[in-house]
């Protein structure tokens, strides 16, 4: 099973709590995290894009780096790990995104790919006059399909004459083209989102579910398998989990409870309000806005000792259609080190990393 890191491009990572580590996103922080992850054999690193935060006393996600430029910098200081930037497709034309990706492909020597997002948080786009209207909630995957087709055309042939409802290319060109096969990620969970991923993506990003229920996402992975049957492609799932690990189950649980006790209710309420605006939202967005465990945006959470977390991650790997997991931590620097030293060596699904290190 592949292991990735969802790097903290926004302040405070993925914890909406005053009891969690409070920090600003910087290039140096993310460089340290990704270089450490690369040293422990992580397969990929992905950065999101966020253009406006949730407010509250923690100013959650009010401070964010930009995804493509961050990953370009990280491409220059890494050598093996695959890197994915996220493009907010309402903000950057596909031909420009294709050229940016080709540039980072050159910097990284073929280790770059793109995560495509349509945009669900209206204030991110309204603030710069780019929100197309609420009807976009219903047509966004049609828009994204055209966007992805233009990308594929330009990367495959260097030119595009695509004509659609949203984009019109006229002998549009990109050169040099990427040397590697450019991979696309999408996070579609609605019926339209799954259909898009099965047609255009290489991996589909989904949320884990619940606390210490590592296989609860299995129905989502199964829906993707069924969508693949209609397209004849083999798009696999990549599942997001937060790791809260310690020497004992009790110590890890105490830390998790302390984080929840400091929940920034104002920021969480803002998330719930904006998340409910998209009536056509898939399960990911509805899950994010659910107040049940919104302190970490309701991503799947694995809490326990090193051995407990290793066992649960191996359970994740057993779900059909699962390519890998993408991890977040309460403390990213320590979390990556603890994973590499104390959790990964106990994982059956990562035995190949230990064997590789023995050979080296």
Curated annotation (Swiss-Prot):
GO MF term list: alkanesulfonate monooxygenase activity; uracil oxygenase activity
Name under which the protein is recorded: Pyrimidine monooxygenase RutA
Pfam families, alphabetized: Bac_luciferase
Reaction equations catalysed: uracil + FMNH2 + NADH + O2 = (Z)-3-ureidoacrylate + FMN + NAD(+) + H2O + H(+); thymine + FMNH2 + NADH + O2 = (Z)-2-methylureidoacrylate + FMN + NAD(+) + H2O + H(+)
Chain's role: The FMN-N(5)-oxide reacts spontaneously with NADH to produce FMN. Requires the flavin reductase RutF to regenerate FMN in vivo.
Organism of provenance: Pseudomonas savastanoi pv. phaseolicola (strain 1448A / Race 6) (Pseudomonas syringae pv. phaseolicola (strain 1448A / Race 6))
GO biological process, one term: nitrogen utilization
Positions bound to FMN: 49-50, 115, 124, 140-141, 190
EC number: 1.14.99.46
Entry keyword annotation includes Nucleotide-binding: no
Domain of life the protein comes from: Bacteria
């Amino acid at each position: 099973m592949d292991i990735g890191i969802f790097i903290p491009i926004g302040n405070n990572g993925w914890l909406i709590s005053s009891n969690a580590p409070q920090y600003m996103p910087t290039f140096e922080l993310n460089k340290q995290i990704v270089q450490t992850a690369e040293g422990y054999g992580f397969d990929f690193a992905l950065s999101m894009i966020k253009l406006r935060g949730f407010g509250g006393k923690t100013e959650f996600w009010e401070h964010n780096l930009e995804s493509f430029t961050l990953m370009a910098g990280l491409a220059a200081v890494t050598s093996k790990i695959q890197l994915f930037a996220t493009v907010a497709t309402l903000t950057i034309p596909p031909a420009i995104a294709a050229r940016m990706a080709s540039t980072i492909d050159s910097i990284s020597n073929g280790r770059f790919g793109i995560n495509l997002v349509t945009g669900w948080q209206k204030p991110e786009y309204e603030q710069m006059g780019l929100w197309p209207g609420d009807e976009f909630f219903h047509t966004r995957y049609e828009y994204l399909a055209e966007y992805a087709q233009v990308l594929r055309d330009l990367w495959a042939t260097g030119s595009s004459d695509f004509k659609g409802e949203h984009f019109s290319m006229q002998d549009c060109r990109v050169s040099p083209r990427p040397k590697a096969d450019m991979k696309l990620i999408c996070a579609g969970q609605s019926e339209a989102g799954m259909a898009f991923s099965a047609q255009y993506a290489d991996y589909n990003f989904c949320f884990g579910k619940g606390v210490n229920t590592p296989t609860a996402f299995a129905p989502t992975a199964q829906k993707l398998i069924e969508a693949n049957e209609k397209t004849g492609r083999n798009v696999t799932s990549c599942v997001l989990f937060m790791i809260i690990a310690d020497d004992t189950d009790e110590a890890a649980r105490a830390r998790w409870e302390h984080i929840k006790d400091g929940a920034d209710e104002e920021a969480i309420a803002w998330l719930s309000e904006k998340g409910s605006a998209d009536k056509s939202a898939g399960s990911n967005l509805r899950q994010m806005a659910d107040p049940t465990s919104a302190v970490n945006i309701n991503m799947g959470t694995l809490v326990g000792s090193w051995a407990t977390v290793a066992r649960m991650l191996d359970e994740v790997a057993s779900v059909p259609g699962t390519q890998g997991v993408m991890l977040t931590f309460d403390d990213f620097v320590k979390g990556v080190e603890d994973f590499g030293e104390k959790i990964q060596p106990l994982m059956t699904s990562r035995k190949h990393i230990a064997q590789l290190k023995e050979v080296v």
